[in-house]
């Protein structure tokens, strides 16, 4: 870690998250290696994983954290074209299906 950097960000509810995350933009070309890399990152404390419906990597992230979901902090994003109230709900449901989980830790507008 960078000298002087906080090791965790603590939310009001006490949940702690690493301030550095693993991005998944343009992943998917070397799927097995990328899944192993994401898992290794979580094992080493890089628990925040950033994905988005636009990236097409939510299924990859879901596979990577299948056995360690409680340790991972998943961030995903809705496309602006899906950002109406109903559209966001539908997009989130699709993201949950692709991730293979029943919750996303932080859901953002892309």
What does each model-identified segment do?
Residues 26, 39, 43, 66, ...:
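Glycine/proline-rich, positively charged
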Residues 75-77:
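Generic beta-sheet signal
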Residues 1-72, 102:
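N-terminal binding-site loop/beta-alpha segment at the start of enzyme catalytic domains
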